[in-house]
Every structure is written in structure tokens, then in C-alpha cells.
UniProtKB/Swiss-Prot annotation:
Keywords: ATP-binding, GTP-binding, Nucleotide-binding. Displays ATPase and GTPase activities. Belongs to the RapZ-like family. It comes from the Bacteria. ATP binds at residues 20-27. This is Nucleotide-binding protein Swit_0399. GTP binds at residues 73-76. The keyword Disulfide bond does not apply. One of its GO terms (molecular function) is GTP binding. Residues 289-313 are annotated as: Disordered. PANTHER family: RNASE ADAPTER PROTEIN RAPZ.
Length: 313
């Protein structure tokens, strides 16, 4: 594939099935993909899929060579999770470049988003929002299990989601495995889209040092304190060794995205320092990781920047 997913002559057209929980950000994703040059079709009846794919863009048309993103979910007429999975596998067997992108979000956050926007859940017209969320999660389970890529938007704002999509599907996205190193706070829950997760709570904690507590793991003094733990050098070496062993295997197996999550109690000191240190080592080894500190800077106000990537979509 060339930049932004544009297809070279003779290559199969890339097809991305965009699906997931209502309110998790699918509509935001489709809009972002369209802005990046993708052709997008939302809420396509599954029965019309073959007809759409058979109608290849005419030579010289605006859609020629553009990758295709299809929004399919529980709102779709004749929707069937297992049926969609079968169709995707059939496309692959026929030589098509087809994959599934699934957007997820915690039930609590989905409920909050619907409450905040006062939107109705598509599967809870005459029931509680929580009932609709639970029912939809059950319906979508086969798609989630078969997904090639999972994006959890529980802690993501609209802007953060758009930035993530630009990194993964935009002009700067290349071939190979896209690598993300994320720090997080166990107190705020583990990231559900992590492929590898490491717990830094065995290291001594700068939180209990008054002059270090106000600063983050980005501070050199905080980093020096953490690195001064007697177990730190060996633990770091072993963790890096394991990751460097596994990453080439992930790429060999065709995994497009790998997220390494580094956690500590508050997501401010140990996990932040170790994530930065790990990313630096990975760059030395020829990788190009993106670093994200999930809980280091929380949104000041939902009113300043929406944390609802796509309620009702």
C-alpha cells in the first residue's frame, strides 16, 4: 500500500469494516477517514455489500484507487455479526485486502455519554440505556473477537481519536506494525486495547518523596530516583529483552498495531518514566513508537473539549 492507503495499479482495493459499540466513535472515525481521502459508506445493508464491491470505481473517477471504509453495526438492516465475519473472510479468501476495525468503550462511559447528550440508544428505544448497551455488546461479540484492530475510546476525546486515526490511516501511516507505548494508572482502569502490559508498582514510588511528588516521570530527578531502585536495571533489561523478542514475531504474523501498556498506581511517575525509557530503547533498535501518557494530563472540562467521540453512531 502507498501513503494514505491509496492503491497501486493492480493491487486489491483496501476495504475496512468500521464497526463497534454505539457511542464509541464510529461516526467520528468515518468522518476522519473521509477527510484523509477514503471513500466512506455508513450504515450499508449487509445484503448490498457484494453489489457495492462489484461496482469498482470507473477509471479516472474520483474514487479510483481510494480505500473504502464501510460503517456496519447494529443499526444496519439485516445485521448479523457472524454473517459479517464470514463475508470478510470470504473477501480475504478471494484475494481482497479486507479488515475489521472495532471501536469499544466501557459501559459506564457509554452511559455517561448518552446521559450527557440526551441521545437515545438505537437498541433501547423503550428501555434503559444500560439495557441497550448490554444487548448490543452481546450482538457484537463475534465481530469484536474477529477484529483485526481494536480501539478503546473510553479515555479518548474527539481530538485524541482523530489524531490516533491520522497516525494509523493518514499520509504518515506506512507499512509494517504501528507501535504505541502507553503509560496508565491502575486506579483509572487498565487499557482494554493493550497487547502487552507491564506493572511498575514493584518500583519505589516518588509519590512518597515530598520534593518529587509534584513532578511527573518526565522530570529528570524523578527518573533518577526511580532508576536508583536496586531492582530497576535488571527488571528494565528483562522487560526490554522480552519486548524486542516479541515485536518481530508480531510483525511476521501480520499484526498491524501493537500497544504496550506500562502501568503504575497513579499514572504519573513510574509508568511515565518507564514508558519514555522503553520508547527511547525501541527507537535505538529501529522502531518508531508513539508515546501516549493516558492519565498524566486529564481533560480540564468536558465542556472545553468533548469526550464523546460519537454518541448515536
Amino acid at each position: 500500500m502507498t501513503k494514505a492507503g491509496m492503491t497501486k495499479a493492480g493491487e486489491p482495493r483496501r476495504i475496512l469494516f468500521v464497526t463497534g459499540m454505539s457511542g464509541s466513535g464510529k461516526k467520528t472515525a468515518l468522518t476522519a477517514l473521509e477527510d484523509m481521502g477514503w471513500e466512506t459508506v455508513d450504515n450499508l445493508p449487509v445484503s448490498l455489500l457484494e453489489r457495492l464491491l462489484a461496482a469498482s470505481p470507473a477509471e479516472g473517477s474520483i474514487d479510483e484507487g481510494r480505500p473504502l471504509a464501510l460503517g456496519i453495526d447494529s443499526r444496519t438492516r439485516d445485521f448479523d455479526s457472524r454473517g459479517v465475519v464470514r463475508r470478510v473472510r470470504s473477501l480475504r479468501d478471494g484475494g481482497r485486502d479486507a479488515s475489521i476495525l472495532f471501536f469499544d468503550c466501557s459501559n459506564t462511559e457509554l452511559s455517561r455519554r448518552y446521559s450527557e447528550t440526551r441521545a437515545r440508544h438505537p437498541l433501547a428505544r423503550d428501555r434503559q440505556v444500560e439495557d441497550g448497551i448490554s444487548y448490543e455488546r452481546e450482538l457484537l461479540a463475534p465481530l469484536r473477537e474477529a477484529a483485526d484492530e481494536l480501539i478503546d475510546t473510553t479515555d479518548s476525546s474527539t481530538n485524541e481519536l482523530q489524531a490516533l486515526l491520522r497516525r494509523r490511516f493518514g499520509d504518515s501511516a506506512g507499512t509494517g506494525t504501528t507501535l504505541t507505548v502507553m503509560s496508565f494508572a491502575f486506579s483509572r482502569g487498565v487499557p482494554r486495547d493493550a497487547d502487552l502490559m507491564f506493572d511498575m508498582r514493584f518500583l519505589r514510588n516518588p509519590h512518597w518523596v515530598p520534593e518529587l511528588k509534584p513532578h511527573s516521570g518526565l522530570d529528570p530527578d524523578v527518573g533518577a530516583y526511580i532508576a536508583g531502585d536496586p531492582i530497576y536495571p535488571e527488571a528494565r533489561a528483562r522487560i526490554e529483552e522480552l519486548i524486542l523478542l516479541l515485536l518481530p514475531r508480531y510483525e511476521t504474523e501480520g499484526k498491524s498495531y501493537v500497544t504496550i501498556a506500562i502501568g503504575c498506581t497513579g499514572g504519573k511517575h513510574r509508568s511515565v518514566h518507564f514508558a519514555e525509557t522503553l520508547a527511547s530503547r525501541l527507537r535505538q533498535e529501529g522502531f518508531s513508537p508513539t508515546v501516549r501518557h493516558r492519565d498524566l494530563t486529564r481533560q480540564k472540562s468536558n465542556a472545553e473539549e468533548s469526550t464523546v467521540p460519537g454518541v448515536g453512531s
